[in-house]
């Protein structure tokens, strides 16, 4: 990933987080945290990794809500950032938090068994 795409990714992360938490009025989108944004080298696609507070049902509902709100989020980004072309957004669930929690539970169980 180039330096420019990394910088754009970091700025997108900040802006998308702010838009979701302050501007987005979709009731299907619950407590969402943007954990990472990866932008392609040509800045045409941004993979937005999010975590959602809640169970599988809330996670699916929030991801669907984000997909439906993609146009609004892109228009807000266009107003906030000086980009010739706003990247297409692809929302993905970040499973690294769940994986970390699973490892932590396994370690705690091992320590308890000693």
Swiss-Prot record:
Domain of life: Bacteria
Major location category of this protein: cytoplasm
GO cellular component: cytosol
Keywords, sorted A to Z: Cytoplasm, Ribosome biogenesis
GO MF assignments: ribosomal small subunit binding
Subcellular location(s) per record: Cytoplasm
GO biological process, one term: maturation of SSU-rRNA
InterPro entries: KH_dom-like_a/b, RbfA, RbfA_dom_sf, Ribosome-bd_factorA_CS
SUPFAM superfamilies: Ribosome-binding factor A, RbfA
Pfam families per record: RBFA (PF02033)
Function comment: One of several proteins that assist in the late maturation steps of the functional core of the 30S ribosomal subunit. Associates with free 30S ribosomal subunits (but not with 30S subunits that are part of 70S ribosomes or polysomes). Required for efficient processing of 16S rRNA. May interact with the 5'-terminal helix region of 16S rRNA.
Family: Belongs to the RbfA family.
Subunit comment: Monomer. Binds 30S ribosomal subunits, but not 50S ribosomal subunits or 70S ribosomes.
Descriptive protein name: Ribosome-binding factor A
Designated gene of the protein: rbfA
């Amino acid at each position: 990933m180039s330096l420019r795409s990394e910088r754009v990714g970091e700025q997108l992360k900040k802006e998308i987080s702010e838009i979701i938490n302050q501007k987005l009025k979709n009731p299907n989108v619950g407590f969402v945290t943007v954990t990472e944004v990866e932008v392609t080298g040509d800045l045409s696609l941004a993979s937005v990794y999010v975590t959602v507070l809640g169970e599988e049902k809330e996670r699916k509902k929030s991801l669907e809500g984000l997909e439906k709100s993609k146009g609004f989020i892109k228009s807000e980004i266009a107003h906030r950032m000086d980009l010739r072309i706003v990247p297409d957004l692809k929302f993905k669930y970040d499973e690294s938090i769940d994986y970390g929690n699973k490892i932590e539970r396994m370690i705690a169980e091992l320590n308890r068994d000693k």
